[in-house]
Amino acid sequence: MSKTSLVTAFILTGLPHAPGLDAPLFGIFLVVYVLTVLGNLLILLVIRVDSHLHTPMYYFLTNLSFIDMWFSTVTVPKMLMTLVSPSGRAISFHSCVAQLYFFHFLGSTECFLYTVMSYDRYLAISYPLRYTSMMSGSRCALLATSTWLSGSLHSAVQTILTFHLPYCGPNQIQHYLCDAPPILKLACADTSANEMVIFVDIGLVASGCFLLIVLSYVSIVCSILRIHTSEGRHRAFQTCASHCIVVLCFFVPCVFIYLRPGSRDVVDGVVAIFYTVLTPLLNPVVYTLRNKEVKKAVLKLRDKVAHSQGE
């Protein structure tokens, strides 16, 4: 971190909205946050207690639910504070560093994890007989660990490039969280090189992951079309549809914010809601409502709890 920074705290402007909407927005985002945490905790619990879900697909889903739960926790509580009172908009310099790091750490790890999950679906559908041996427990653990380590490295680059610059004057961040683009606008130095490296870094991660996901699904579609039974094709498509929905809801807003020329603070703040608030909620909804195995496990857990309480 830069030793020449004079700024000790930043002010988050919060989500762009009319002043009279503070209370309604606070209520809405609080409900969404609680549902996000409870929904992802439910998925973690269901997969943990149901032995039928101890498969590679659900192993990666537990990682995704864990990430989403904390990804939402890194961003939403502070956003709620900005809606409660003006003092809630203040964030210390070091807290801002921490939020930026964990925001990119969890976000990029999720990006890498989506890529691994698409590869897992490709192997399951294209090589059903060899799938178990190809996705062994050790390989699953290696792939999951790689996503976390890659996310950590990516986040370290973003954080160092952002806060290595001096901040000696303006301290108002035009966002509801500490993110690199709005923070760099406050630096008391030339940021062109930093912005270029950050742009290339995010571009390589986002475009690389998305390209691999697209290639996986092109191969999956080709494999599905070779399935002779309509029931088999329907089940394969249903399995992949959930993943496709979540991937699109995550990648499209990210690409819009980080990889388009120019930046509009108001538009970026609104679009960021999709992947910081809605996507973590969408994951448990999509994977429970569209997944028969998860729904069956949830009902089984409910019956088990009801039976234990009735005794």
Curated annotation (Swiss-Prot):
Extracellular topology ranges: 1-23, 74-98, 160-196, 258-268
GO biological process: detection of chemical stimulus involved in sensory perception of smell
Alphabetical UniProt keywords: Cell membrane, Disulfide bond, G-protein coupled receptor, Membrane, Olfaction, Receptor, Sensory transduction, Transducer, Transmembrane, Transmembrane helix
Nucleotide-binding is among the record's keywords: no
Disulfide bonds: 96-188
Gene Ontology CC annotations of this record: plasma membrane
Parts of the chain on the Cytoplasmic side: 45-52, 120-138, 217-236, 290-311
GO molecular-function terms, A-Z: G protein-coupled receptor activity; olfactory receptor activity
Gene3D superfamilies assigned to the protein according to its UniProt record, in alphabetical order: Rhodopsin 7-helix transmembrane proteins
Transmembrane segments: 24-44, 53-73, 99-119, 139-159, 197-216, 237-257, 269-289
Topology relative to the membrane: Multi-pass membrane protein
Entry function: Odorant receptor.
UniProt name for this protein: Olfactory receptor 10G9
Organism name: Homo sapiens
Lineage: Eukaryota, Metazoa, Chordata, Craniata, Vertebrata
Gene name for this UniProt entry: OR10G9
